């Protein structure tokens, strides 16, 4: 399904589908890098370079967050960026929306530029540490850690979030 759709659909009974899509896109980028180093044929390089951009298929331009997408192309509804699990693995949309390690400039562009990117990134630390644990039916330890840290919706299990500031040369913000 991923190869055909360019994302793992939300409505096909595959858990953690958006997380999988983001991870597969990164994996494809890694394969592309290895294939390039091994001087593989251009057709093969293009396949993996193109699939590395599949993260864009689960980016919702309205919420500016990653979101589950159904097989028919519609985004999952209802949607709560605070819902842990479901379309994500031990995290939520606020956490996974930054999981584009291989194309940070592409993510910045999708969000509408550096100013909006920083505002969204700041929001992770500003929004209250609220959560929806209905997928798990209980508070898992990652949720508890997030609430105890009291740093908004930042969960330290997703360490790349503060490092995202460095893509904008905002090292001083990343250090706090």
Regions found by a protein language model. Name each.
Residues 1-5, 166-173:
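Conserved small/polar residues in nucleotide/adenosyl-binding loops
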Residues 2, 24-26, 88, 96, ...:
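Aromatic side chains
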Residues 115-119, 169, 174:
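Alpha-helical multipass membrane-protein architecture
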Residues 3-40, 44-55:
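Active-site cavity-forming subdomains of large catalytic enzyme subunits
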Residues 32, 37-161:
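Catalytic cores of carbohydrate-active enzymes
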């Amino acid at each position: 399904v991923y190869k055909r759709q360019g994302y793992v659909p939300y409505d096909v009974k595959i858990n953690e589908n958006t997380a999988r899509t983001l991870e597969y896109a990164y994996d494809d980028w890694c394969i592309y890098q290895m294939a390039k180093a091994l001087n593989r044929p251009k057709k093969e390089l293009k396949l993996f370079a193109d699939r590395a951009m599949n993260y864009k298929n689960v980016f919702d331009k309205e919420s500016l967050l990653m979101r589950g997408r159904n097989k028919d192309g519609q985004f999952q509804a209802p949607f709560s960026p605070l819902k842990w699990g479901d379309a994500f693995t031990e995290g939520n949309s606020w956490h996974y929306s930054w999981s584009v390690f291989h194309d940070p400039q592409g993510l910045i562009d999708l969000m509408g530029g550096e100013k909006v990117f920083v505002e969204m990134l700041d929001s992770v630390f500003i929004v209250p540490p609220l959560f929806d644990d209905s997928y798990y039916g209980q508070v898992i330890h990652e949720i508890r850690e997030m609430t105890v840290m009291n740093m908004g919706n930042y969960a330290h299990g997703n360490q790349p979030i503060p490092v995202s500031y460095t893509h904008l040369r905002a090292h001083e913000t990343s250090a706090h």
